[in-house]
Amino acid sequence: MTKAGLVVVAMATALGTSACGGGQAGATSGNGGAPPAHGKAPSAAPSGDGTRSRSAPASPAAVERLSANARSGASSLTRRVPWNLDILDQRSRPLNGKLTTAATGKGVHVYVIDTGMDIAHKEFGGRARLGADFVGPKDSGDCFGEDGVGHGTFVAGVIGGAKYGVAPKADLVRVQGIVCESEGGGSTPAAAEAALVKSVKWVTAHAQKPAVVNMSLNLDHRSAALETAVKKMVDAGIPTVVSAGNYHDDACKHSPAGVPGTIVVAASTPTDRAWNDSGSYGSGYGRCVDLYAPGQKVTAALSGGGTATEDGGATSWAAPHATGVIALYLSAHPHATAQQVHVWLDHTATRGVLRGVRSDTPNRLLDTGGI
């Protein structure tokens, strides 16, 4: 695999939506309604990295109590892993080739709103199941990009793959809300957005807690309908992780990254830089971003079987790392609120280690916080 940027599998050029697994989506905006007036405003809590956190205020002692509660009574699991997992439990270089956690994600339901999921994949070990399909005939597969990678399967693999996933025992739920490019046909931007809205509403109504949602996708505009649905999902107590987008612009300009309470993840590289290929192609940035996570040279499951390393960068690959870490935390601390999860994730991140991060964007790198 040479470029994750080829994996434009969801409502891209024709439909004005990007599954953020690379590839610059088209500029067809559709209207989608006006965005909420409030945008995604920061709170008064200092982030400690030169920017202001959007999370709920919390003292360092309170955050440490959350981490301690998560670690209590758990035995550690150490695995040999590629760099994108290795870095999650290390504050500094060099990496040691291992990931050690005190939790596995067991008992946590992860809802992956995406192009589909190969639920029979060996990496998922029988832990993946069909939740709902709002875009086409039900099947157990996934869409394929130009390079043969199933976007949703790869994302799910980062979250909960047995060998290459952050939370190797989490339960994965397929929620197909993104139209495959090959199935574009008579679809329209409005129809594509409607499928996403239905997906979000379904998760809000049917989620089994503890639960977390992954949305490795972005519209190329703001949609009041989608943002309203996502806000209700967050308000229902479900942590919701969103990719910052591959447009290399302000993540706040896109839905659902502009929704208050969502956890927005930008992409970093193996050399500890903010991912930016060139020009208008790179990670989203700005005050709506919560933190960075590995988004280049990521290894995970391929639809149809096997695994591969995606050499190119994508925020779609970054977001599921954060989702997996949340699954780890929730498996050890299942009664944590969405707000507590959000605060904990932001405050346990490693600060100031990335290069090429804009001054208007938090310089925070995802960390497991010892869970």
Region locations from a protein language model:
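C-terminal motif of bacterial Sec signal peptides marking the signal peptidase cleavage site
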Residues: 16-19
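Sec/Tat-exported extracytoplasmic proteins
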Residues: 92, 116-117, 121, 125-128, ...
